[in-house]
Amino acid sequence: MSCLDVMYQVYGPPQPYFAAAYTPYHQKLAYYSKMQEAQECASPGSSASGSSSFSNPTPASVKEEEGSPEKERPPEAEYINSRCVLFTYFQGDISSVVDEHFSRALSHPSSYTPSCTSSKAHRSSGPWRAEGTFPMSQRSFPASFWNSAYQAPVPAPLGSPLAAAHSELPFATDPYSPATLHGHLHQGAADWHHAHPHHAHPHHPYALGGALGAQASAYPRPAVHEVYAPHFDPRYGPLLMPAATGRPGRLAPASAPAPGSPPCELAAKGEPAGSAWAAPGGPFVSPTGDVAQSLGLSVDSGKRRRECSLPSAPPALYPTLG
């Protein structure tokens, strides 16, 4: 019994492709095994006749193997594990053949031309070109986009004929100029603009009453820099209230008291401290217009009243125990 017969008896029948590959070798091994069994089982008397009868096929098979040694050479078997045996049918050096194959394949120039390049060239040569194929120099960018030191021209007044002729342009000035980009942030507040909601104006976005009626429709809508201008005005603080340095210029100078008058003359007249601020002709319409200023006045008037209520007589002497 041969090694192949033992292996396939243990691990079951071979696969179809293995069976097709090993069929001639199985037949040859079975033929030689039958010959050996027949020679051993033959009697000594008939050994001569048996040897003469079996002498003819043996030389024929030997000649056949000598005539085609490469075709009939069995594959090389390599044991990998208990369930895998590798058979190699290739004859020769595998590494040299692989190197020769790849060197031959790499030596030939590539004749592959992708269809995407041809279609792209055809599309670019046509009358319609894609937007991405235009270079940056052919696009309609203003001069300040290419030159950072470009100075934007001064816009003409609204009443001039030059401004009327170019009024249909989308931009009155260059949108990329530094003066245009930073002009809105540093522009001061208008004279008519106030941060308080009770100062209604047609241009104010929060104006009430008639500002939202026919009068507002006659004026253009306020720009962004007009709405947010008080944020960047140095006269206003972080809470949109005028700073302390800007108030004395708006208020009327107070009259200096007489030398002989007491310091509480304002409170002695019976006139409240906040009435001068809330008067119709005063600088503010109501005390709520400026919360910080009214609080400061109330604190000052309280201090003056306390000073007037204190007795001016000398302190009383405490009685001493005799």
UniProtKB/Swiss-Prot annotation:
Pro residues compositional bias, start-end: 312-322
GO MF annotations in UniProt: transcription coactivator activity
InterPro entries with a match to the protein in the record: Vg_fam (IPR011520)
Ranges that cross the membrane: none
Disordered: annotated span: 42-75, 248-322
Low complexity: bias regions: 42-61, 248-258, 270-283
Tissue: Skeletal muscle specific.
Ranges of Basic and acidic residues composition bias in the record: 62-75
GO cellular component, one term: cytoplasm
Short name of any one Pfam family annotated for the protein: Vg_Tdu
GO biological process: positive regulation of transcription by RNA polymerase II; skeletal muscle tissue development
Top-level division of the source organism's lineage: Eukaryota
Keyword Coiled coil: no
Function as written in the Swiss-Prot or TrEMBL entry: May act as a specific coactivator for the mammalian TEFs. May play a role in the development of skeletal muscles.
Oligomeric form and interacting partners: Interacts with TEFs. Binds to TEAD1/TEF1.
Family label: Belongs to the vestigial family.
Protein name: Transcription cofactor vestigial-like protein 2
The species this protein was found in: Mus musculus
Underlying gene: Vgll2
